[in-house]
């Protein structure tokens, strides 16, 4: 990973045209040659970037300036010294580097002019193990299966990922009365999740060996619209407290 801190400007051309005026910014250049430009404030997203596959080259600023001069003279736009230096470039002086990044699959070009470089360092970050997500639906499913009485006292687990013709139900259990309960689990429960649970329950209730099958819609958060729809369909909503399920002291359970 190459990290450059510099006063820079940038021009992007291709599918769209965009420019960044001269300012102090951070540039990240990855091993795949992708380049990202960041500012101090604003979004976590870069101001401009070129992603792989791409090719990056360092252009000699003097050669670029000379080429620009020849093109200006050939075009008859201006003559003399004014052809080579605008008032802004005279004030700023010659840039230290020019980076040109070209898309390998297209005509897009990002050209970054580094007017003054404060730092230019390269680091070997090694192989990254990747992001390990905590609190995803699979974790919620596993914890709820291990603590199945959260859906009701006396409940027993039948199995996780209970197979059906239209896809697996997250959890199938039986309640204290011995009736089957299908549990659909989401991190953030919306109307789509309730509709999914509805399809499962309608299918499962056609099987005389399983019916009646009740439905529980379980999530860390459930939208008000989803709560209303679930209640209308005869389902129970269960709010899952992930920290609690991992073993924190608060063992409260909210059913509504």
UniProtKB/Swiss-Prot annotation:
HAMAP family for this protein: NucS
Region Disordered, residue ranges: 62-97
Xref: InterPro entries: Endonuclease_NucS (IPR002793), NucS_C (IPR048301), NucS_N (IPR048302), NucS_N_sf (IPR049173), tRNA_endonuc-like_dom_sf (IPR011856)
Alphabetical UniProt keywords: Cytoplasm, DNA-binding, Endonuclease, Hydrolase, Nuclease
Originating organism: Bifidobacterium longum (strain NCC 2705)
EC number: 3.1.-.-
Pfam families per record: NucS_C, NucS_N
NCBIfam families in the record: PRK03298.1
Name of this chain's protein: Endonuclease NucS
Keyword Ligase: no
GO CC term, one of those recorded: cytoplasm
Cellular localization per UniProt: Cytoplasm
MF-aspect GO terms: DNA binding; single-stranded DNA endodeoxyribonuclease activity
Biological function: Cleaves both 3' and 5' ssDNA extremities of branched DNA structures.
Segments forming a coiled coil: none
Assigned protein family: Belongs to the NucS endonuclease family.
């Amino acid at each position: 990973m190459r990290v450059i801190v510099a006063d820079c400007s940038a021009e992007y051309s291709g599918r769209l045209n965009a420019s960044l005026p001269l300012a102090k910014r951070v540039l990240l250049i990855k091993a795949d040659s992708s380049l990202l430009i960041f500012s101090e404030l604003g979004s976590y997203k870069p101001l401009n970037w070129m992603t792989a596959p791409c090719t990056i080259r360092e252009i000699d600023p003097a050669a670029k300036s000379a080429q620009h001069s020849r093109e200006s003279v050939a075009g008859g736009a201006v003559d003399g010294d004014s052809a080579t230096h605008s008032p802004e470039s005279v004030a700023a002086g010659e840039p230290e580097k020019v980076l040109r990044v070209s898309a390998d699959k297209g005509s897009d070009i990002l050209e970054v002019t580094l007017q003054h470089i404060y730092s230019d360092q390269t680091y070997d970050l090694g192989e990254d193990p990747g992001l390990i997500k905590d609190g995803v639906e699979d974790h919620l499913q596993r914890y709820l299966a291990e603590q199945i009485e959260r859906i009701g006292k006396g409940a027993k687990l039948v199995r996780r990922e209970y197979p059906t013709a239209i896809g697996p139900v997250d959890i199938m259990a039986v309640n204290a009365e011995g009736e089957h309960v299908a549990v659909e689990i989401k991190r953030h429960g919306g109307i789509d999740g309730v509709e999914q649970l509805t399809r499962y329950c309608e299918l499962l209730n056609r099987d005389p060996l399983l019916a009646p099958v009740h439905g529980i819609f379980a999530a860390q958060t459930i939208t008000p619209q989803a709560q209303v729809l679930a209640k209308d369909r005869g389902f129970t909503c269960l709010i899952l407290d992930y920290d609690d399920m991992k073993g924190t002291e608060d063992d409260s359970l909210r059913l509504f």
